[in-house]
Design a protein with these regions (language model features):
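Bacterial N-terminal signal peptides that target proteins for export
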Residues: 1-8
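Sequence-pattern detector for short linear motifs
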Residues: 8-9, 198
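Bacterial N-terminal signal peptides
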Residues: 10-17
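Extracytoplasmic/secretory-pathway proteins
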Residues: 20-195, 200-321
Length: 321
């Protein structure tokens, strides 16, 4: 460890003559509030970690300039485009059209036979199955949205479905899942079922069961898998299984750039006991390194100690590059 620190110091001294200095903002707009910073933190190798760079003005670095849109690819959009390419569907569409279809098209427009998107999707079997899924997802959308009452600090779920409505959509989703021939779409149905149960508030155990039955068995390293894992972690947290929940949040943080901020904000360690219990869920040193990184990004943590912990068990970790 001493040799490593000495090497880092030597490297830092060596690059001083060749590196233009970088100013850091100290929390205000006046020159005297700036400080000297030898290293440009924007040279970070993993752009998915950019929101966690040093900042004194916002909860996450660059929130005023929305760096996510500039630095992080849309993992959901890319997953859809990969699926369409694999199944020779919607190949004439560009990225902007994909975004409109996936994020802006209404349920009503997806039910119109004359809609250009409906016509295009109906050209292939994968497209027809996608259209059926998107219609189902749009039906559930109102129950997953947030509403602002008095402001952003008082945001709540817009509505939970009644028990009757929940049963209807659950049964519909299960039927669509069973008859869908595409694993990528089955995974998305599984995610919808987990999320629907989780947002019912009194269906946390059912949300966990839905994950175990309809998401986990598909064994897909996919953005939607980690979105479902995040919902499952929330359900576990709601029933008091904090160690398991924190571990799952660390898995989401480790594997999905687009979900990192949510996973970080949801990760809650209140005592050494909580930490030790969460660590027992880790299967290898890579997973432990992600846990140390999550704890290290906390405002009140000892960052140097967490870096040393990671170096000791997993020196190739992306969190120290």
């Amino acid at each position: 460890m001493k040799y490593l620190k000495r090497s880092i110091l030597t490297l830092a001294i060596a690059v001083i003559p060749f590196h233009s200095y970088v100013n850091g903002c100290g929390g205000d707009y006046y020159d005297y509030m700036n400080y000297y910073n030898l290293f440009d933190q924007l040279l970070l190798e993993n752009k998915g970690l950019q929101p966690f760079l040093l900042t004194t003005d916002y909860a996450f670095y660059g929130e005023d300039t929305n760096p996510d849109a500039e630095q992080q690819p849309d993992e959901n959009l890319n997953a859809w485009m990969t699926f369409f390419k694999k199944n020779n569907t919607l190949q004439e569409m560009d990225t902007a059209q994909f975004k409109t279809l996936l994020y802006s098209a209404s349920y009503q427009s997806l039910k119109q036979p004359s809609s250009p998107y409906v016509i295009a999707l109906n050209k292939t079997d994968a497209g027809k199955q996608t259209l059926t899924y998107l219609q189902y997802a749009k039906e559930l959308e109102p129950y997953a949205q947030l509403s602002e009452n008095d402001g952003w600090w008082d945001m709540k779920r817009a509505a939970s479905p009644s028990e009757e409505t929940y049963a209807h959509y659950k049964n519909k989703g299960l039927e669509l899942y069973q008859h869908c021939p595409y694993h990528e779409l089955k995974l998305r149905y599984g995610y919808q079922l987990v999320r629907l149960a989780h947002y019912m508030r009194n269906k946390n155990n059912e949300a966990i069961r839905m994950y175990n039955l309809y998401v986990k068995p598909l064994k897909q390293e996919h953005y939607i898998y980690y979105a479902a894992l995040e919902q499952t972690a929330g359900a576990l947290y709601n029933i008091g299984k904090l160690a398991n929940a924190n571990y799952l949040y660390s898995r989401v943080f480790d594997h999905s750039d687009n979900r990192k901020k949510i996973a970080y904000s949801s990760f809650r360690i209140q005592s050494e006991v909580d930490w030790n219990e969460a660590m027992t869920w880790c299967k290898d040193n890579r997973e432990k390194a992600a846990m140390y990184a999550l704890r290290g990004y906390n405002t009140f943590s000892n960052e140097l100690e967490e870096v040393e912990n990671i170096l000791e068990i997993y020196p190739e970790s992306p969190y120290i590059k």
